[in-house]
Design a protein with these regions (language model features):
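Positively charged, low-complexity, intrinsically disordered RNA-binding extensions
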Residues: 139-251
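N-terminal cationic and glycine-rich segments that engage phosphates or anionic surfaces
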Residues: 1-116, 121-125, 130-139, 208
């Protein structure tokens, strides 16, 4: 299992605390608002909105919160005006990072990100310096007990997925961006509900980190993900799960 999916699995377990859940709700609400602003408030004709709503329901977000976020996005309710922005940077050991944020003040977060990254052994990079290290892909996670590997393979590959991996606690499915909805529909027809499904930035290659660099990398990712304006952090590290767990537990 790659460092990318190992981190996602551990992060999902950590999100169970109330403080983490509050941040998850904030991020999902902002994603719903942005999706509705860009593609309209009807999830049937707006795949990004449909995916964001699924993320909210997976976190047990109340329907009224989802509906208000949609209305703010379409302009039917007043609310803050968010801007989507992506920053590029390097972490310990030359790990490439993409930081996707939704903010009301781009200038403010540039300084905040620069401080967080430099404090943890990295630096911000110019636009284009890191982006080429990643592919835009669909990512779906399905509970392990939902189906056997053979059945999952039949369903997702026939629907257009690129790959199916065992990530320990679930099935990790990678799709071309344009096939994400079709694979989700195929899973739904088979009675399978994903834990998550989203467009992501998947590393082309991974950089192995150990020891102090591994610990510093985990702390950097945590610090960025705890920033209120950060939606996602993508990084091409590969760290043994035991080292990730140790670093998470030390914080």
């Amino acid at each position: 299992m790659s460092g990318h999916s190992k981190w996602a699995t551990i992060k999902h377990k950590k999100a169970a605390t109330d403080a983490k859940r509050g941040r998850v709700f904030t991020r999902v609400i902002r994603e719903i608002t942005i999706a509705a602003r860009i593609g309209g408030g009807d999830p049937n004709s707006n795949p990004r909105l449909r995916t964001a709503i699924l993320a909210g329901k997976n976190e047990n977000m109340p329907n009224e919160n989802i509906e208000r976020a949609i209305l703010r996005g379409t302009g039917q309710l007043e609310g803050e005006q968010y801007e989507e922005v992506t920053f590029e940077g390097y972490g310990p050991g030359g790990v490439g990072m993409l930081i996707a944020a939704v903010t009301t003040n781009r200038n403010r977060i540039v300084g905040e990100f620069r401080h967080l990254i430099s404090k943890n052994g990295g630096n911000l990079a110019e636009t284009g310096a890191v982006g080429w290290m990643f592919h835009r892909k669909g990512e779906i996670v399905v509970p392990k007990e939902a189906a056997s590997e053979d059945k999952m393979m039949d369903i997702v590959l026939e629907a257009g997925a690129d790959d199916l991996k065992d990530d320990g606690s679930g099935w990790y499915i990678v799709t071309p961006p344009e096939a994400l909805e079709k694979v989700k529909e195929a899973l739904a027809k088979a009675g399978i509900t994903p834990t998550s499904a989203e467009i992501s930035m998947v590393p082309q290659n991974y950089i192995k980190l150990t020891g102090a660099q591994a610990t510093q990398m985990v702390r950097l990712i945590e610090a960025l993900e705890e920033h209120d304006d950060v939606q996602h952090v993508y990084a091409n590290f590969d760290i043994d799960e035991s080292e990730i767990q140790a670093a998470v537990g030390a914080n």
